[in-house]
Amino acid sequence: MAETVKVLVPEEDVAKRIKELGEQISKDYAGKQVHLICVLKGGVYFMSVSSYGDGTKSSGVVKIAKDLDETLEGKDVLIVEDIIDSGRTLYYLMDILAKRKPKSMKLCTLLDKPERRVKDVKVDYVGFNIPDEFVVGYGLDYAQRYRNLPFIGVVEGVE
């Protein structure tokens, strides 16, 4: 079977939901200076945290590859994640960041797989709850491919 990508969340739905999340976050943080921590390939304040190797399953071992360059004490912090699966990475990260004494700390994710959760993390802003499938597009990749797709999709035909 040839490898294909099936659309799970169309481009228009992704754009609409991101706009809605942005409006809600702007409303919730009105008059405050929010410090974003993006657990992605890039962000405002960048922190690289991973529990994935080269495969499609979490390794279960969380590593911090790059830490923050500034203090969080007394600051309103919003962690932005692309996808939450088992919750291990975010549980570990939020525990570390809580010890740095932020004034507040909330979590935003574009995609959430609550049925895969093995660590309890409170997600304050969710784009989409999705089924337990390996997804690509909109920044998410499979073996360094499909990252630039404008929609969220599921790779089919992969063992």
Describe each region flagged by the PLM.
Residues 1-159:
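PRPP-associated nucleotide enzymes
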